[in-house]
Amino acid sequence: MAKKAAATPKTTRKRAADDTGRSRKRARVQPAAPLNPIPGPSQSTEKHILLVHGAVDAGQLGLSDDQEKEVMRPRVHPLVLQLVTEDKMGPSGLEGVAAGGMHSLILDSNGKVWSFGLNDSLALGRLTKPPDGTPDNIPELVLGLDGFRATAIVASDNLSIAISETGELRAWGTFNSDGLLGFMGHKDKVMVPTALPAFSKKLICAAACGEDHALALTCDGTVYAWGNGASFQLGRRILERRKENGLKPEPLPLRDVVAVFAGTHNSFAVDRAGAVFAWGLNQMRQTGVDDAEPLVKTPTEVHALHPDNHAGARVVQIAGGEHHTHFLFDSGAVWACGRAGADRLGLADDHPRVRPKRDDFLVITPVRVAFPPPPTPADPAPVLPPYTAGFSATRIAHISAGERYTLAVDEDGILYSWGEGNASQLGLGNESNAQTPTRVANTALKGHRVVVASAGGQHVLLVGVKRDGTL
């Protein structure tokens, strides 16, 4: 008689079923990787220092009372250099800078935030009046950030924001250019860096500031906006009699956003597919939105900037002023739109979009901005070639804009500026205007490679490293 196969013990079947169930359960709760990572501390081994130029009337360059006249060309900041040399700003010196309207923030590689400049709105995050205050015109640490390792900083005209390595956002100062207060629920200016209730359960990976509004981006790709919404820069309608409603951060109807940027009175976002969205003030066509009204009331795609129209290249940075905007692509090309008068866009006279009307005209659809060729030993100061010669090989790595001027840094650390600079914010000495991107060159920059530039109201902060590798 044939033997029957031994029956599988019930306990074994049950255990197998339990194991399978546990396996499925484990698989179901596996968290997906976040769309946007929280910025971490710099891993650089180079010493980063601060260079500055521009207006000094509010102490925004942090040069103390020793500097009474505007700084016409970039110069190494002596106090910060001393702090970096003494390793008081961490192993690699500076990690970041943020120039506001008339105040400045710097982030060191210990994760500490320093401030200097105008403190009428408490944007410095510390007391500056005697007898207990510290000077407002030299770098001093922001108070109330113990245990908070900052990895990113941004600044508006009167507001300051820091993001930590754990995704926490704190802000201080105010939105007061239109009589507004600092934050929902606060009746006065806020000096101590404050966590916003709207983000208590959110991880923030990036932020951006216009003149009087702010954007925050979460790790899951959601954009929040708050501040002054008079020009729809918040992407929603704010009634004049209910202006305080703009002080509460609210999410925008956008998904999978990977970057946010702000012009003076408008806002921008880039999603995972590379599409660019804009909203806010557009009376000079500075958003780039096709056939748009003077106010773009909700996030609207800028079709001209889609990767399909740029051989797959994507926008990675946007820098906007009052009436102009520049867009940096990952190909190193820069495009611009808005008011072209007063040299805002950096277009030469022979550019096809300039010829019809030179006085003051609008560029509705973004056009590419030309840069001089990279310098060589034989030609250390090349000029901009004719438009018909095509675009040079210069690749831009970083851009920043003030109200009426723009800065760009190329891959070799060379700084360019153009636009209006009546307070020496162009860094070109006696030249207060530059029609096209012009190399900023002087003794201080000759030995330094610029890494990051931040354009403030009328002052500029630069992060630089020595080209020879020394401090």
Regions from the language model: what does each represent?
Residues M1-R24:
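PEST-like, low-complexity acidic/proline-rich intrinsically disordered segments
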Residues K14, R26-R28, P37-E46, L50-R73, ...:
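Short glycine/serine- and acidic-residue-enriched loop/turn motifs that recur at repeat junctions
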